[in-house]
Amino acid sequence: MAKIDFRNKINWRRRFRSPPRVETERDILRIFESDRGRIVNSPAIRRLQQKTQVFPLERNAAVRTRLTHSLEVQQVGRYIAKEVLSRLKEQKLLEEYGLEELTGPFESVVEMACLMHDIGNPPFGHFGEAAINDWFRQRLAPGDALGQPLTDDRCEVQALRLHEGETALNALRRKVRQDLCSFEGNAQGIRLVHTLMRMNLTWAQVGCILKYTRPAWWFEATPASHSYLMKKPGYYLAEEEYVARLRKELDLAPYNRFPLTWIMEAADDISYCVADLEDAVEKRIFSAEQLYQHLYDAWGNHEKGSLFSQVVENAWEKSRANYLRQSAEDQFFMYLRVNTLNKLVPYAARRFIDNLPAIFTGDFNHALLEDDSDCSQLLELYKNVAMKQVFSHPDVEQLELQGYRVISGLLDIYQPLLKLSLEDFSELVAQERVRRLPIASRLYQKLSTRHRLAYVEAVNKLVRTAPEFALMEYYYRCRLIQDYISGMTDLYAWDEYRRLMAVE
C-alpha cells in the first residue's frame, strides 16, 4: 500500500511557465490563488449563468442556473474539505499525511473544482449531450467499426471507413468514430481548460475535475475494479497526451482518480438533490406540502428517530411552527437544506477518511455517498422524487425536447462544413472566405475565433504526408463543430437556431 503523502498529489506545477521553485507555504498558496483568479474570471464560468440546471430557458431569476448551482456546490465542497481537515487534525494525522502546510491548497483545489465541474456541459444539459451523440452516431455508425471492415458500413465519411489490409489505420478509425460519438460534459471540461481556454492551471487543479477516467474512444467492457470510475467518458482522444502527462505528474495509475475529486463529487450530489426540489416548488410544479407528502410516501418504513424524521420531518415541523415569521415554504427549504448538510457532510468526510488508502491511490470504486447507509438512502430519496415528480413533468419534458431539436438543428445547419473535401476546407481555413463556397464561408465565419485557432493548431501538428492525416484532420474538424455548439449558452443556441431557420 502506498504511503499517504498529499505533497505528492497537490502538485502546484503547471504545464507551461511553472514557477522554478517555491520555498514557503505562502508561495504555494499564492500559486493556487492564481488558479482561483484564472477560473473565476474565465468566460466559461460566466456562460454558466445562461445554461440550464433543470429548467431550460428559465426567466425566473430565483430558479437556479448552472452558475448558481455551481456556487452552491463550491460552498458544500469547502464545508466537506474543512470537515475532513478538522477530523485529520483531531486525529493528529495532518503532518503524517503531508497536509500540515497544505490545508489552504487542499480547500482551494476542492472549491475551484466544484465551481468548474459543469463548465463543459452543452446547452440544454443532458439532452444537449444526447443530441450531439445521436447526431454523430447516425452519420458515423461506430458500431459498424467494431469488427472487420464491412461492405455495408453505414459511416457516411469515406476517411473513417475501415479498409482491408490497413490494420493500424483501422484501429485509429475505430477510436475516432467512437470518440466523436461520446460527447460528455466532463470530458469537454478537460478540453476547455487545456485546449480551448488555455488556462494553464496547476496539475492538481485539473486533476480534480477529471471525474471519470474512461477514454471517450473506449468500446470494450470496463474492468470490474473500475466499473464506477469508468462509467462515463472522461476525456477525448484530442487530450490523450495531456491526460497521460497529468497522470504522471499526479502519480496516478491508468484509470485511477485524483483523491480530492471524491469530495467535489459528493458536494455536487448533496447540492443538486435538494436544489432541484426547491426549484420545482418555485416553478409551482408542486407545493412544499405536496413535496413533503411525496418524500414521506417514498421513504417507506417510518420509525421514530430515523434519519428521515431527523431531517425531513424536523424541517417540516419547524416550518409549520413559523418561529422566524417568514413564509413556511422558505423556512421548510432552509431547514431541509441545513438538516441535510448537517447529516451528509460529516458522513461524506468520514467515508473519505475511512477509505483514504484506496482514495489516495485513486482506485476507490464508489462515490462517497453511494452505499447502504441511511445517508445514501436519503440522497436517493431526493433523487427519486425529483425524477418521478420533476423531470417527468410535461413542461420540463417539452422544454427538453425543444432543446434536443435545437442542438440537432444547429448540427444540421453546420453540416456543410463537415461535408467539404479536405482540400476545400483547407482552402477555406487559409482564406476564411472562398467565393465558390458561399454557404460554407458564411458558416465558417460564424465560428468562434478561439475554436478555429484550436483546430488550426491541432492540424498544424499533424504530418501532412502521413497516412492518417485525412482521418485526423476530419476528427479535429468535427471537434471544432462540437466545441462551438457545446460552448453556446441555452439562450444563444435558441436564438441562433431561430435566426438560421428563418423563424423570425
UniProtKB/Swiss-Prot annotation:
An MF annotation (GO) of this entry: dGTPase activity
InterPro entries for the chain: dGTP_triP_hydro_central_sf (IPR023293), dGTPase (IPR006261), dGTPase-like (IPR050135), dNTPase_1 (IPR020779), HD/PDEase_dom (IPR003607), HD_domain (IPR006674), PHydrolase_assoc_dom (IPR026875)
Top-level taxon: Bacteria
Catalysed reactions, semicolon-separated: dGTP + H2O = 2'-deoxyguanosine + triphosphate + H(+)
Cofactor(s) required for function per UniProt: Mg(2+)
Limits of the HD domain: 66-273
Function: dGTPase preferentially hydrolyzes dGTP over the other canonical NTPs.
The protein's name in its UniProt record: Deoxyguanosinetriphosphate triphosphohydrolase
Classification lineage: Bacteria, Pseudomonadati, Pseudomonadota, Gammaproteobacteria, Enterobacterales
